[in-house]
Amino acid sequence: MDQRAITQDESGQFSFHQPRLQWSDFKRNADGMVPVIVQEEGSKDVLMLAYMNEEAFLKTVETGLMTYWSRSRNELWTKGLTSGHRQEVVSLIADCDYDTILATVHQIGGIACHTGAHSCFHNPIVSEDKLEQKSVDQENL
């Protein structure tokens, strides 16, 4: 089933249609927001984690530009309006519990983080070479 509210064709044209999910379908946190995991189209890099309230969700669906609620500034924030590093929506997909949105985006300028980095995830906690590979018993999932 196609869960996308907004799609972008190969020429870069957006196609907007009525989303299959409405804001009322989401399970929101105590502040009335839903976390959004932002992933770059193509590379599949995780760029950032942000939050949407209803107004941000509706504006994102309406414009095709990722819009969030800034918890620190208490205001609506369309990514890239001042920096030029816009995030154009490729798809919006809800997780199985309807409490998180995965946004696939076309990241303009290659920078998503306010620090100037490509991704907000650039502070290693445990390096891959230190992680032990463990097999998962699929029957016990």
Task: Please give the residue ranges for each predicted region.
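C-terminal binding/interaction regions
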Residues: 2-33, 40-47, 52-141
